[in-house]
Amino acid sequence: MSIDFKDISVVIQGPVQAYQGRSQEPGITHKCIASIRTHLPGATIILSTWEGQDCHGLNPDILLLNKDPGATIVSYNAKGEPGKLNFNRQIVSSAEGLKQVTTPYAVKIRSDNFLTSNDFVAAQQAFPARNDASKLFTQKVVTNTSYFRRYADGQKIVMLPSDFFHFGLTEDLLKIWDIPLFPDREFDPTKAGSPQYRGAPKVGPHAEQIYCNAWLRKLDSTVPYLQHRHQNSPELLAYWERFIASNLVVLEPEQIGLGLIQRFIPKSKRPNEICHQDWLLLYKQYCDPSIAISKFDIFKTIGWKRMCKLPFSYIKHQLTQIKK
């Protein structure tokens, strides 16, 4: 089944100018909208940004000027100074945009990314096999490899997918983004003088892990609360790998047709990130044994780099923890 572009809405979420400490490449959102008109003619464009943003000349089909929920307090340092992240801004701009979608399919894209092709549309249905016991989405959701991490500090980790780009059924994207806002972390006076954050004194989860853990636990009550970045077990790792094989299609940006601004483009593939071949091997293992991919194929591209770099990353992390 081919998907008609008119059955797709594209939610562009985030600021269109530099905002609250986040820099923005001038004209990038204009470029984003123009790229959608070029590569998805007939699709509905929804820009979901903030009150007070100058949207002159952007001309989306639907413009949402959301009330800014502000940054979320997620930590306190030893001096009691709060650390903040944009958890709720990401949720509000994404979820409110998706709630305006009336088409069966939707794209969620950052306001500082753009399209270079529409290859992701066909890719969404190119890997139809599922592991029935692991199906949480109605159909596959396409996401990209950039910042989708398999390793942190030389260790395998779980629940750290990329949040740059999603394409799939609108109902499935809402499963990811329509989640409750995160409350500010309250300062605990009994822990004054020590850092306070999720997982302390261990290394706290990455922001993407916290998002993913929230929506995955909403979909499956057996998923544990992720206390720290490296929380893992053979059972949890297998669960996560089955999930991404059965519910996602993980592609390189160029396979999707996703354009990234310069600061998101690495000089070479990062060894700690998943690659499409990694995902394809998991898809073969859990969903479709006929797929032609092997561990040696991965070794020839990124595997040898991991063998060289990950042990040193692990040793460096352990030394850092000892110094604490």
Language-model segments: residues:
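N-proximal low-complexity "stem/linker" segments adjacent to membrane-targeting elements
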Residues: M1-H30
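Active-site-proximal specificity loops/subdomain of glycosyltransferases
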Residues: S48-Q100
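Short aromatic/hydrophobic "clamp" motif used to bind/position activated sugar donors
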Residues: A106
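Active-site acidic Asp-centered loop
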Residues: I109-R110
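Catalytic core and acceptor-binding pocket of nucleotide-sugar-dependent glycosyltransferases
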Residues: L115-A123, F127-L281
